[in-house]
């Protein structure tokens, strides 16, 4: 081995490092002589970071210029060199393993011309960032010259950080990603970057205090004193502590509406701000660790100085709403008064029955949306954030089978509930038995969405943008002509409706309507009544595994029989997505036994030849209905004018 305890006097902390790697780093750092802190305390000298979007990183970048931000490879590489007995330089590989300034930053540019554009691109790549020519959802920062253009508009819509170019230069100067709030485009030039980070002068009192703390730390480590004594003498107050208790804000609404509110989609899109604390919650606390909750000073309450009036909520939900709003700084008023800022109603409350309030009216989904995005939205920014339910729309949505694509997070959850109370059925999977594929046109189409659109078009499922639904909700009138919002470009195709899960109602032609009316008024065929059971009654008693929707009436004593089949057509889709397509054929008056026969079951070849022999041997009458039944499989004989039975 090399020098004994090369990291003695170093105090190391981690952020956004997974549990396995964090354990490795803490173990090896301790063997190298460093002190490892789970919490970000004042004596920390090196922060090992896996992402820039964490509280520890942000605090170090802004308020601790003395701290060196390192990559996760530093300790393992240094440890291997140490155990191999290599001579370690005075820098202890620190300079080689600094975390790149723009680590995990994906930068896009807009409204910046040449040659400045090429210069910025080169600096982004040089300092470890990724340059993105096109704006996508995974871009972290948009550097804009002016507050205009499509990229700028979509960046605001997608909650992407929009900054001026000074953000890049100051981040490079600080060797860390600075917070975008100090580099807004609408700031005066003299205020841009003001307060973004502490510029540490070695001669200042603050710099000396940091130096003294580090000396104290080294002296205490050398003297072998306990961490408890060190904390007492060096005043080790935790700056940012790990999270040891449940996070109330993220589950405030899980019981609202008798269902859990899903936040998992958003955690997939954007890394959770405090994800680096999560693994440590399962670790037992050591005796020398301070068991303190995360406490960030001066965190503003979301609903601070806002007063709410709750209208027509059940008592169980009133208590939850009261706790949710009060925990986030809101006030609840028991009576309507001039101090009210918002009236909150249930999302299912009919608009027509709502009194006229002189205050902005929202539903509880507006509160969920604000909590989800951690910002206050205007009541007109989303159609489902204010009263929208109209019972008059329910008959129009009844029978609609809808599948959603391109939606995530709280918007997906709210959209499902809204369509359900409007009378539609929302399915998790796309199949042929769907009326509409509702697409989120506010987002770029993913490959999965494109795949669904392609198959929906092939299956005659209307592909419609979500703006169609927003227009219905805002106007209060159902719009059956979806062409202005159609993505499938099928102008005249009507929307399919379903009476139940397995039967589809198709638009019928005038000819089919007249024929069905005539069938309802007179007996089928030219037979006389008899006591023999009809094939239809026998069919009803068959096993459930026989999937036949064929209407057959035969008279065993009649020379003429009329058969009206419904042929089953199976199209790839969900497990239950079998389309029963009604096909009614008006028979011609036969002068001889009908010879055009086929079978619903393709495996009934043996029975086919048997029946063919009966037909050819007796030309005076069709065999009785009972003889047309396979005793083993219960197969049904049907007739069709457009098929011919051929001897095999």
UniProtKB/Swiss-Prot annotation:
PTM sites of type Phosphoserine: 592
The BRCT domain, residue ranges: 2-92, 96-185, 298-384, 392-486
Domain of life: Eukaryota
Pfam families: BRCT, PTCB-BRCT
Any one Gene Ontology BP term: DNA replication initiation
GO molecular function: signaling adaptor activity
Keywords: DNA replication, Nucleus, Phosphoprotein, Repeat
Coiled coil: none
A GO cellular component annotation in the UniProt record: mitotic spindle pole body
Subcellular location: Nucleus
PROSITE patterns (UniProt xref): BRCT (PS50172)
Transmembrane segments: none
InterPro entries documented for this protein: BRCT_dom, BRCT_dom_sf
Motif, Nuclear localization signal: chain positions: 242-249, 643-648
Function comment: Essential component for DNA replication and also the checkpoint control system which couples S and M phases. May directly or indirectly interact with chromatin proteins to form the complex required for the initiation and/or progression of DNA synthesis. Interacts simultaneously with both 'Thr-187' phosphorylation sites in a crb2 dimer for establishing the DNA checkpoint.
Subunit structure: Interacts with drc1/sld2. Interacts (via BRCT1,2 domains) with crb2; a single rad4 molecule interacts simultaneously with both 'Thr-187' phosphorylation sites in a crb2 dimer.
Name by which UniProt lists this protein: S-M checkpoint control protein rad4
Originating species: Schizosaccharomyces pombe (strain 972 / ATCC 24843)
Gene name of this polypeptide: rad4
């Amino acid at each position: 081995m090399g020098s004994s305890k090369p990291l003695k006097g170093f105090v190391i902390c981690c952020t956004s490092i997974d549990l396995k790697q964090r354990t490795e780093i803490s173990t090896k750092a301790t063997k190298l002589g460093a002190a490892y802190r789970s919490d970000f305390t004042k004596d920390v000298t090196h922060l090992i970071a896996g992402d820039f979007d964490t509280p520890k990183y942000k605090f170090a970048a802004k308020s601790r210029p003395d701290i060196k931000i390192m990559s996760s490879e530093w300790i393992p590489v240094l440890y291997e060199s140490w155990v191999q007995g290599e001579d370690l330089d005075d820098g202890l590989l620190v300079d080689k393993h600094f975390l790149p300034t723009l680590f995990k930053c994906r930068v896009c540019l807009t409204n910046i011309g040449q040659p400045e554009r090429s210069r910025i691109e080169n600096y982004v790549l040089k300092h470890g960032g990724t340059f993105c020519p096109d704006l996508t959802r995974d871009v972290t920062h948009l550097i804009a010259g002016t507050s205009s253009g499509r990229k700028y508009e979509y960046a605001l819509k997608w909650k992407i950080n929009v900054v001026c170019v000074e953000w890049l230069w100051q981040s490079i100067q600080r060797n860390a990603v600075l917070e975008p709030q100090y580099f807004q485009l609408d700031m005066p030039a003299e205020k841009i970057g003001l307060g973004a980070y502490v510029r540490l002068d070695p001669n200042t009192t603050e710099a000396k205090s940091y130096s003294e703390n580090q000396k104290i730390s080294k002296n205490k480590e050398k003297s072998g004193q306990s961490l408890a004594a060190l904390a007492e003498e060096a005043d080790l107050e935790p700056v940012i502590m790990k999270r040891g208790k449940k996070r109330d804000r993220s589950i405030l609404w899980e019981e609202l509406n008798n269902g859990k509110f899903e936040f998992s989609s958003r955690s997939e899109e954007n890394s959770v701000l405090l994800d680096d604390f999560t693994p440590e919650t399962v670790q037992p606390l050591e005796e020398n660790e301070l068991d303190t909750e995360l406490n960030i000073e001066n965190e503003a309450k979301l609903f601070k100085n806002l007063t709410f009036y709750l209208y027509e909520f059940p008592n169980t939900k009133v208590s939850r709403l009261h706790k949710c709003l009060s925990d986030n700084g809101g006030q609840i008023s028991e009576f309507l008064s001039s101090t009210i800022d918002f009236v909150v109603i249930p999302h299912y409350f009919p608009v027509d029955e709502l009194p006229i309030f002189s205050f902005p009216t929202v539903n509880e989904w507006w509160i969920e949306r604000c909590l989800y995005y951690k910002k206050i939205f205007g009541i007109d920014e989303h159609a489902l954030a204010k009263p929208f339910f109209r019972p008059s729309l329910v008959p129009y949505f009844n029978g609609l089978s809808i599948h959603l694509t391109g939606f995530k997070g709280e918007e997906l959850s709210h959209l499902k509930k809204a369509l359900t109370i409007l009378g539609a059925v929302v399915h998790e999977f796309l199949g042929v038995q769907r009326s509409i594929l509702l697409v989120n046109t506010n987002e770029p189409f993913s490959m999965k969405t494109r795949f669904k659109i392609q198959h929906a078009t092939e299956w005659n499922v209307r592909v419609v943008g979500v703006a169609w639904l927003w227009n219905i909700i805002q106007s209060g009138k159902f719009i059956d002509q979806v062409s202005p919002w159609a993505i499938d470009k099928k102008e005249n195709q009507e929307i399919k409706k379903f009476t139940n899960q397995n039967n589809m109602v198709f638009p019928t032609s005038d000819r089919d309507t007249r024929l069905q009316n005539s069938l309802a008024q007179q007996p089928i065929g030219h037979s006389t009544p008899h006591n023999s059971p009809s094939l239809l009654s026998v069919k009803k008693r068959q096993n459930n595994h026989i999937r036949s929707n064929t209407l057959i009436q035969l008279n065993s004593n009649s020379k003429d029989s009329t058969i009206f089949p419904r042929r089953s057509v199976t199209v790839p889709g969900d497990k239950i997505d079998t389309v029963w397509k009604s096909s009614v054929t008006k028979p011609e008056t036969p002068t001889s036994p009908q010879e055009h026969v086929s079978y619903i079951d393709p495996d009934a070849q043996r029975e086919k030849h048997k029946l063919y022999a009966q037909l050819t041997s007796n030309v005076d009458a069709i065999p009785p209905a009972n003889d047309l039944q396979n005793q083993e499989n219960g197969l049904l004989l049907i007739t069709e004018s457009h098929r011919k039975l051929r001897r095999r």
